[in-house]
Every structure is written in C-alpha cells, then in structure tokens.
Amino acid sequence: MSHFPKLLSSQIAFDVARTMLDGFDKHYRLFREVSVQAKTAFETGDWAGLQQLQRDRIAYYDERVREASVILEDEYDAENIDDEIWRQIKLHFIGLLTNHHQPECAETFFNSVCTRILHRSYFNNDFIFVRPAISTEYIENEESPTKPTYRAYYPGTRDGLGACFERIVHNFQLNAPFEDLERDIGYVVRAVGEHFGDFRIAPNFQIHVLSSLFFRNKAAYIIGRVINGDKTFPLAVPILRNAAGQLSLDTVLLRQEQLLILFSFTHSYFMVDMEIPSAYVTFLRDLMPRKPRAEIYTSLGLQKQGKNLFYRDFLHHLQHSSDKFIIAPGIKGLVMLVFTLPSYPYVFKVIKDYFPPPKETTRELIKSKYQLVKRHDRVGRMADTLEYSDVAFPLSRFDDDLIKELEKHAPSMVEYQRSEDGGEEIVIRHVYIERRMTPLNIWLHEGTDAQVEHGIIEYGNAIKELIAANIFPGDMLYKNFGVTRHGRVVFYDYDEIEYLTDCNIRTVPEPRTEEEEMSGEVWYNVGPHDIFPETYRTFLLGDPRVREAFLKHHADFFEASMWQGYKERLLSGQMHDFYAYDAAERFVNRYGASAPDNAAQDNTTLQRAAA
C-alpha cells in the first residue's frame, strides 16, 4: 500500500517541485514558439526553415530534462534525497498543477526527470505518476477568450456555407495573399455538396474549427468537424503555397479514413500552437474514436506524452490478457530480433549483439539510423518508432523459444529481476516498438492478382516518395516493407538507410572480356555508396505476377536516370511536394479550369438550402 506523508513540511520538497515545473513550463513555451515560427515559415515559403524547426523541436524535450536534472543535482543533491522527501515532492507538484493547462504533459516531464536522476531499482510508484493525478477534462483557456480551443460557425444562416467558410479562412490571419479564394471556396462548397448530397439541415447544423493551423511539410491544415443532428463528420482543408507566394485551398477531406491517414504514424509530427493540448486531443479523438490517444499526442509533436500513454495502455493490456510474447512470424532479420504479442498490434525490435556477414554495422550506427528517421520527414512512407530503455516484462508471458532467441542473439540486452510483488521479470535494456503490419512479401505471395498489382504500385510509389525526400532505403527487399490497414506500403527496416544525395548512382559497365560477361560474380569495383538500379531486377522481379505489375507501373524504377533525376533536384535545393491524401482528391484534378462557374452555381444551391 502506498505511503504518503500527512504533513508537507519540507521546503526542499516544494523547491524541487517548483524547479521541475519551471523546467516543464520552459519546455512548453519553446514548443509553442516553434509552432508560431512555423506559421511565418509557411507564409514566406521557407521550407528548409520549416524542416529545421521540426528537427530542433524533437530535441527540446530531452534538453529540458537534462537541464532540470543538472539544476536539481547541483542545488539540491537530488540523488540523495530520501524517500519521504520524494513523496512530498510529488504531492507539492500535484498542488502546483491546479489550474495548469498542460497537467498531463507536466506529469510526464516529472517522470522523465525522476527516472533520469534515480536508478530504476530505486525509484518506485510512490515517486512518479504511474497514472494521471490531475484530470484534463473541461480545461478552458480563460485568459485568452480571443483564441479558444475551437470556434463555432453556423452555415445555416442566409449567408450560406461559402460565406461561412470565408470567415473560417480569414480567422487564421495568414500573412500571404490567396491566388483566388473565391474560386477555392466554390470548390469546397461543391465538394461538400457532392459528398453529402441532399441532406436535411438540423437546427444544430454547425461547423467547429480548431483555432490553430496544423503545419507539416509544405502545407497548413484547417481541422474541424461538421455537426448536423446526431451526426459528426470530419473536416480537413490543406492550404498550399505556390512559387509566386500565393495560397490556395487544395482540397477538402470529409471521410474518417482520410483523417486517419493524415494523422498516421507514418507521417512526421504536426506543428500546432496549443494552449490546452488535451482539448485538441479530445476534439480529434471525437473524429477518430478508434485512434489511441497516445498516437494523437504523438502526431501533435508531444511524442513523450504519447510514449507515456502508450506504455500505460500496454500495461493495461498485459493486465487484461494472457497470451505469450512470441518470435514474430516471417523472415528473421540479420540485425534485429523481432517479437510480438499476438493480441497487441505492435512488434518489439531488439538490436542483436552481433551481425553475420554481409552486414557491417554497429549498435550505435543502427541507433543513429533510427534517430535519423525520427528527425526526418517520413512523408507517410516510414513507420514511426517508440524507443524504450529498461522495460520490464513478466517472465511468465515470454515463450520459451523467444527467451532462447534473446539469450542467443542479444544476451547483453537481457537481464532478470524480481518485481515488487515478488514475481520474476525479464528486463529488455533497449527496444524499439512499431505498429505491426502485414509484411509486403507475404502480401504479394498470398494476395489476389488485384492485391499484387496494388502492392507493387504502392511499393514503387513508396520508394519514389522516399528518394524524393532524400532517403535511400538501402535494403529494398519486400520483407522490409509492410502494408498498413489502409493498404499503404510503408518502409520499416532502417539499418541501411542513407541520404540519396550521399549515394553514387551508377550503371553497370560493359564487360571487357568474355570471362567478365560470363562471370557469376561482380567483376567491377563497387564503392560503399554505389548503387546500381538496373541490378534490382534480379531480386524484385522473380514472381511472374510481380514482374508484370512492376513493368506496367514502374518500369523506370530500374533506370539510373530516374534515380539521378531525383538526386539532382535535391542537390539543386528543390523540395518535392507530398500529399497526405490521394492526388485525385485535389481540386486541380477534380474540377480543373472550368470549375469556378460550376462551383459558384453549387454554392448558390447550398446557400438556398441552408437558408
């Protein structure tokens, strides 16, 4: 049973708690400043600056945790504070969070500082927040009524949907001109009419729009919901900027599946200015009820909060399940030992202690590759990973074959201990956790002809989008790619990735002799960063169905000129345009040049109906 002091008598306890909260408040202030700067970068088309903001922000959390830990060590000798004082520190911290707007994130920051200062064998659940202590329900921003979490709009007035949406756009106060906002709003109204058709407008017909834009890649997104009667529908509108500095509304997304892809774990984190992050998460969860809160926090750039919630969800699942962790099905990797819990939709990846030929790498190099992916634009084609250290699992839940594999291939990563209740635990010293997907090689082997064709189209698109983002996957075997539940192909094996601009793209030289021509070995010199696209045929086109689909849709994949073209554009400073939605949904592809007149007519019809 937890023991808590009846009297908070320590000044040091209060001072330590105050120092921790000051550290978090500094972190969140800097976090929000990045989102404000992202708006300026978007308005001016500073795409490199936008990417740099994204990379810098990822490092902020750990920097503030280190900073707070150093202060506590230097000023309070925190490592030697006794148990009674630590319990008081936690209670003081809870008191300081009264009326705080980010209490859940502050609690996570508190945990991070504690676990950094105290060895895992010392700190216990009395010292940290295993569960949240402060509710995030109904937190309101009373200090700034001009910027609530969301604004409500009522298109059922005589002004109609067009005028309503014009107010929505203008309220974001973007400091850049629109190319033709009237045209774009006409497109929006037309698309909404096509999607919903004839529907009866209820008395509560309204649109709620989150007060901050969502910035990512070269786009800013308006995110909201449409409420009519007892129905709620998602609303997302990407805003793009052209080379002339003019803005346009690119499309309108009205289906839950589209929003799920927009907030997928395969995309980089959004930059959003949120005073009350829990309110944004609640709003988004209303639109995506199947999406875990952990993933929503992560997609909003609060990856440590997402990581904390994921672990709580994981412990809850362990408590309410009984199946065992097993070696993940499929082809075993040379670098990673992968295991899974069948009842849980994730895989756990442990770096092996040694790597058989032809792998030439190290543990630190592999970790640096995963960190590169964390910092880089994943463009919807690379799975995000959660990285944990010293994770304790119930030993009884591990299959015997899995334990043998761990002890054989990663003995330095495994140790055993007794839990607080006396049970046996296996501790994994370092592990990556990723969403479980269907391996592409299995998809292609077992799928119908239509599924094979879809898989190959997606595979080729995924590679092309990755190299457009300056990522060369390295090992492009189908087993290193997965298929998500939305049918998208995603890369998830990062130990051989390189920047495309660091690669030397070559064609295989003509053989000089008959011996070279007949040789089964590579007879020409190959440097460490040389790539030969024409040789990919050998290991990608073995299956006749795969070959037919590949040559039909991606014949240029095996031409060095295609790869070189992407590299040259990157070296010239060009940034590719990526869309987190089907390009067919874009207004330019849906309506083309003749759309404005038709859109205006649809706008009038909807206005009349709304009135």
Curated annotation (Swiss-Prot):
> What main location does UniProt list?
cytoplasm
**Which keywords annotate this record?**
ATP-binding, Cytoplasm, Glyoxylate bypass, Hydrolase, Kinase, Nucleotide-binding, Protein phosphatase, Serine/threonine-protein kinase, Transferase, Tricarboxylic acid cycle
Q: Which GO terms describe its biological process?
A: glucose metabolic process; glyoxylate cycle; tricarboxylic acid cycle
Name the cystine pairs. Answer: none
Alphabetical GO CC annotations of the entry are: cytoplasm
Record EC number: 2.7.11.5, 3.1.3.-
Family membership? Belongs to the AceK family.
What name does this protein carry? Isocitrate dehydrogenase kinase/phosphatase
Q: What is the lineage of its organism?
A: Bacteria, Pseudomonadati, Pseudomonadota, Betaproteobacteria, Burkholderiales
Give the gene symbol.
Answer: aceK
